[in-house]
């Protein structure tokens, strides 16, 4: 399974770059909210996780310069057809993150933040390590995966069709159409 390694599925297909936003947040119990960076570490303090983990290396002109945004590079950081985010490093939350902590003086930070269990255990086992399971990929995605769905039966009552995306109920006429 590719999940929890360096490829993550966004559960959308035919992703479009327009309006695409992606961040990696860390749930920081010390401050009580999700943070796009770590609050400590010589090389990690206040540096966006998206940069530390290799997903922000280019600016909007594809020049090698950080800009705080996800590098939407088809085939390198994203597979738009399958809806996969691709970290350009093998163990983003393991050895890659660990490489930023000073060997002698920051072993406590390495022990606190590095989620090596992702690469040593099954996904189910790793998710149960609550002290480390605090990283989240969040953002906005537009998908061109529209398709037709044939509803069974005849004479479907108008406004009787309910469509949801996750737990969000979509609005007929705005988010989808029904040909009664």
Residue spans of the language-model regions?
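Surface-exposed, low-hydrophobicity segments enriched in Gly/Pro/acidic/Ser residues
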Residues: 1-180
């Amino acid at each position: 399974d590719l999940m929890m390694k360096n490829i993550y599925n966004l559960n959308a297909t035919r992703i479009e770059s327009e309006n695409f936003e992606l961040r990696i947040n860390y749930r920081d119990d010390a401050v009580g909210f999700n943070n796009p960076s770590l609050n400590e570490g010589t090389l990690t303090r206040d540096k966006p996780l998206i940069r530390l983990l290799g997903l922000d290396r280019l600016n909007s002109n594809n020049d090698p310069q950080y800009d705080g945004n996800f590098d939407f590079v088809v085939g390198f950081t994203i597979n738009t057809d399958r809806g996969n985010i691709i970290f350009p490093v093998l163990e983003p939350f393991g050895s890659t993150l660990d490489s930023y902590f000073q060997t002698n003086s920051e072993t406590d930070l390495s022990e606190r933040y590095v989620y090596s269990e992702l690469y040593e255990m099954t996904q189910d086992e790793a998710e149960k390590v609550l002290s480390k399971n605090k990283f989240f990929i969040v953002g906005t995605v537009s998908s061109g995966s529209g398709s037709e769905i044939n509803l069974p039966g005849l004479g479907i009552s108008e406004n009787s069709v309910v469509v949801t995306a996750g737990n969000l109920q979509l609005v007929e006429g705005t988010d989808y159409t029904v040909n009664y």
